[in-house]
């Protein structure tokens, strides 16, 4: 046999590959020619397989990498014939090595299948290394290392050396420090780095890292595949001979041109070096034959620099000739605007061809995407066919939350400023970098990016010392439709064990000690958490107690010295026995003293908290806990523990360290932020391009308002046949037909109401060019005009239908753009899921029906209805449910059953795919649906045996149409014969809940078999962040609430904290059962859902749990919260009213200031006023209508006794509202100005040039002697204005249903005239049009003092623009609500005087006509009629013994909408107001722009009542009267004796009890209100008191008591006299002893509390108001203020 040269054979079959020992496993020299050819064939297959595949054994992934340095015996058998001879094998553990040149006598078949073959680890180098390690370990007998030297140790060492021998060697030329080299080795462990240290340039570490990043990114793709390097350094690829990599290097600025020139220079330098080394060879053909010497030299160059010179020669030829494939200068990427829409090509998107012709499936970006927008990058990837991209960038997680930072590993400083992010490198004087932050940040936050139908997902793979590795990968295959939610966390590793401490910062300007010589503020420092914890723990036990009543600076200094000693002992470096011990971390000298002071503050605060805990233990904490009363009742405990009152804590801290920045945040030591969660939501829907993803910007309303649309998912999966379903051929007549007819009519009516609203919205846009009147509509209005795109965007872009101006049309969406025929489109929440629209079209004709056999299972909550459905299921049964959550639960329990047999009722009616295939029907939660819908589903199914499951006393069907009364609300109303089965045993509810449910169930008893006795916990909270987390419970938790608003807030928190837990509304939770339930209320706004009137909702809410329910409420004091009352199960105790009047000490006669009466004569009219009257709606040809209003008999001046007992005032206030006297909002006001704040004010415009801290803060006020709980005067600041806007204009609770707006408005006006207008007198009113008059305008100017020099034409003036301000004088609450909620300032929204004077004149004429023709049982306190005492005395003496009813409206002004405006307009027009003026005034209120010029805040609003225009009070009075007339029935109207209406206040006096339905007030008029049956007559903060033959309207004495301690009286005697005069004028009736005695009783009756000190307090008020001298004894006045409060008293408008 001829001997072959195997070395030639080897290089011919495995050219360029590194040899493994398993390539030489066969003893080939022993083979014949035939066997040798078989061996060569198998060897080639082995080499080819190793180059492209891996072992595939996951258990060996830690050993075997993609280079396949090991091969198993099983794999070798698959490549070589079994009878071929193999070489000898040397093994250690599972690793074996073929010994070259040996023959073992065994065959391939004898190789072990699971043995790993490869890696020459038995060389002499290995043995020498192993011997040295063993000798060193064994030489140290005390270390015990000798015990570790074993077979396993040797195996690990062999593996390590084997990996090093086969790792990729990369030279790193930059000059680096040892720490930098260590970091690079840690970052890139798969490479063997050769640090040559021969290049020193700018930011070497960043350059070296970028070099290795390039190698790492390229290793993710096949070796020879074409790869795009976007914006990359083409010289780097040339340097390493990567001919398959193409760099797109556009010339975007001068620096790009400079870089390209430098790269060409480096290329020439490299080739010059090669010419010097290889002489003329370098210019020869690279494929030409070279001498052996030159060839060997090139091999050495290849080993050292990982590139062959021949490859460089080939690439350089292209660069030299100007046609290199390594790079181009074309810009990469395509923007969305460059995408072409071609309607002629199947309505598709066309992406233009790129300027660069290079195509590749793979791409990399090495720090080159900073200025390339992500959307443009994706467009470029689509152009070039890229499916996967890997990239790197400089990043810091703190960029998402901070404005500046430092990356130590890269020595890189970064800073965000003016929309850009700036980079600079420490100790580097070269140019820095800056990039657009909006473009840059997308790479840190985006997860899903799309271009047309191409859908890419971005992953942030790893973050290493300032460098972020990311990948962008195209999604292949079909995309599931629906919502896809992604999130990722940015972790701040360096902050894990840190505290953020607030420390004092003192700047001493000079040593004089004068004002301004010392500047004090606060700053933040980062400290070790372990250090701070240790020092505080020790010092808590070591500081000396402090007597704050007599503070000694020496005590403070001693305590600080103790803290500083401990701080030093834990932070300084110690030397013990010659050894240096470093304790924690050193504290910089500038931080040492401030940190010790802050720790001192924290210790004081901790002691304070300890005292609170002890007081809490003694006093007990209940749901009615209030801070003010709690502190007031426990002062004695605080004195005993701390030695000073609790409300002096901040004063002490400020006195301890005097600075201008007062202590407003009591949290001195805070944990640092450890992570930030970034969320993104993607919706994939059907569009013209196919499955097109739509990205949604992350915000509360868009991402977390998850609607559980009944049937939406099922519709997409069901049949698309929209034809009429087949029905069984049966003839049916009877009552069910009427029920189904009502259901279909209801569906049509709802569609009609939605259509009319859409039509009104479209008309408003066509008339005004904007969506005036619907900007703040809670129905999420959207208007699209093809001429301008979206005029107003909706929150969601997934509506099924839209209104085109004439009808509803079905929509398809292209991203956020709808596809429809026509110009206009209107969408609302009502057009998103239009089930009723589909019903009304699909079932246009009502089929005749017969009644099947129906069994009704009416069971209490938790009786096992759903469990029985699951247990009884068999093939042939169809299961339907009204509730989508219930369907999901049944499907989970019956996972093997086809989903088409378990569906919602709505889904089944729209696509009845199983008609005729079932013989029995189960319908769960039947009570939630209209009975006609149930009967229709039964008829369509053709099933004669039906069982309905539900609870007749849980949440019933909700009628969403306010003006569509239903005859059939439940199946019980149908009149069919049901086989009813009552089930009264609950298996779910614990025993304590069952006791409460026994009182709620009216028709069924309830009992439980649960062994859980106690399950109720009530927890007062302040926000959603205090709601317990799911991990606090043992088992699954369900979170439920009443409103979608509360649901979205908690879902937002869960998403931010990466918490997965079920959150539902109570309505959506019906039918569910959980071990633990958290029932929460976040809104403090009164809502009808929380009252007893919504009993079914409360029944469902408290009965979802088996073990535990926690009720978290922000309003624990709300007595109208039925769930709270039921869970508390408190017993109301009655208190006897006591009357304890002390004798008068002296008698005083009331002394009033002289005030000459002004005769009511016609004012003298000036020329400007006459001109204004002629310009603005002058009166008609009829005479100006005036009517003299009768003046009722005067009330004789009362005389009485008075006494001076100031303590009785404080006692009376504490008896009525415990804790109010200790209210001090000074600290809260300061916290509002300097503390963190979150406002929900919607869209506002803020002029930043007007931002100012506080205005009008220099006024001085008189100091009251009595702590009555009066509130401080508010400062005008941006924060106070923001709070006021949030309370007065934002967050309107929408409770309206759908209704016919015009029809109901006309009915309300008709009822108003029928109730309150004497039509005979009305018919005698002048027929002329009301207008303005010069006398009326002049009277307005005389009264207000506003002199208008330049009159304007109102019709040509922008009356839709209002000015805004806040009322600095805060109206205090008559309850104890101020203790638990910060009182926000009221707002005033007003016109310019030139507009107000005209409007006032016109409305003044309307007022006189209204008063002239109203019925006597209506009284609106306007002008002369404000003397209610005379009115009631003349017409209704004796009515104090009748029945009184009071309607208490909440958020009255901002709850008004379009229907209220329409009612007002119709009444004005009927009374003869100029239609042009009415239309002008109405349009101005439809959409108004409001601007506060003090702080620069502006916003828009719609129909909300303006709080300061010319028609506010009268307009509110008309609306209130019209609403009450609409809801009160005619029989109850006959019982009414009189009705008082003033703004939103009302009082009805009737001869017997009447019913005032509250549902229409909420469903139609959007009013949140409650019905009050007062124990005594009370109207507009006045008590109605009978005194002899008179009825007196006496002001609420509680207000008078509080006003004796007013804190807003300017510090001068003149203001004090004015305030006293005004109080004495309004409180004149209290000076009568009989009135005082009756008033003391009535107040106790109204407050339901005993107040024995009240009579004494009223006598003290009498004494105080008797003279200025007496009143001044309650204040300290130093006359430091120039402001004078004036009580305006003048003529009244007639």
UniProtKB/Swiss-Prot annotation:
Its EC number is 2.1.1.-, 2.7.7.48, 3.6.4.13. InterPro entries: (+)RNA_virus_helicase_core_dom, Alphavirus-like_MT_dom, DNA/RNA_pol_sf, P-loop_NTPase, RNA-dep_RNA_pol_alsuvir, RNA-dir_pol_PSvirus. GO terms for biological process: DNA-templated transcription; mRNA modification; RNA processing; viral RNA genome replication. One of its GO terms (molecular function) is RNA binding. Transmembrane segments: none annotated. Residues 984-1145 form the (+)RNA virus helicase C-terminal domain. It catalyses: ATP + H2O = ADP + phosphate + H(+); RNA(n) + a ribonucleoside 5'-triphosphate = RNA(n+1) + diphosphate. RNA-dependent RNA polymerase replicates the viral genome. This is Methyltransferase/helicase/RNA-directed RNA polymerase.
